Design a protein with these regions (language model features):
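Internal catalytic-core helix/loop-beta-alpha segment
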Residues: 86-113
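Hydrophobic/aromatic-rich, well-ordered segments within soluble, folded domains that form packed cores
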Residues: 112-137
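A structured, charge-rich N-terminal accessory region that forms the first stable segment of a protein
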Residues: 2-57
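Long, compositionally biased
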Residues: 142-183
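Short, surface-exposed beta-edge/turn micro-motifs
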Residues: 18-20, 59-61, 112-114
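Short acidic alpha-helix initiation/capping motifs at coil-to-helix transition points
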Residues: 75-77, 103-110, 133-134
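Generic secondary-structure signature for well-ordered alpha-helical cores
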Residues: 45, 131, 135, 164-168
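A glycine-rich, hydrophobic loop/mini-helix early in the fold
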Residues: 37-95
Length: 183
């Protein structure tokens, strides 16, 4: 069930404490996938949340749940425009950037590392990951940390707590709509 996966993997985005989350969703049929995506988006669109399928293969969809207003803010942070320009992003417009990311994902098997920007990872950590080929990090949580370890550890704790609370509330009968904070 798509809603359960969103709660388990994207609670910090629903709670508006993180820009976006990414997860792989197994589906039975294309019709079921698109019906679930459309239903989810209808449910949370007015609260500023959007679910996008970035890539599909072998009945698995790579799903990105985000707050476009937060993504717009993140793409305008100092240094981000110059960083993503190296990967062919000609604009920091969120819709354009997301389409460019989708295109980059279609061109390769692995993840383009700039995806961290879309997931609210600090620019320094994204750059550190690339420069160090994923090695030599200070700590690992939701991402590999190369810069501000203390802040990252606090963020990881907030995200874990949020997910724990959201899973509990969802299991008690709260809907995704009820659990999604308005923008």
């Amino acid at each position: 069930m798509l809603e359960k996966s969103v709660i388990e993997h994207c609670s910090p985005t629903l709670a508006s404490i993180k820009t976006g989350n990414l997860f792989t969703y197994k589906y039975e049929s294309e019709e079921e996938l698109w019906k679930s995506v459309e239903g989810f988006n209808e449910c949370v669109r007015e609260k500023g949340v959007s679910l996008t399928v970035l890539r599909r293969s072998e009945k698995k969809a790579l799903i990105y749940v985000c707050r476009f207003s937060s993504l717009e803010r993140d793409l305008k942070k100092p240094g981000v425009a110059n960083f993503i320009k190296k990967y062919g992003y000609e604009s920091t417009d969120p819709a354009y950037a997301l389409e460019r990311l989708r295109s980059r994902l279609a061109q390769r098997e692995d993840f383009p590392h700039e995806i961290g920007i879309f997931l609210d990872y600090p620019l320094g950590d994204v750059i550190g990951f690339i420069k160090n080929a994923g090695q030599n990090c200070k700590c690992v949580g939701c991402w590999k940390v190369y810069c501000n370890e203390c802040e990252a550890i606090k963020a990881f704790a907030r995200f874990r707590k949020c997910t724990s609370v959201y899973v509990r509330l969802w299991n008690q009968g709260r809907s995704v709509r009820q659990l999604t904070v308005a923008a």
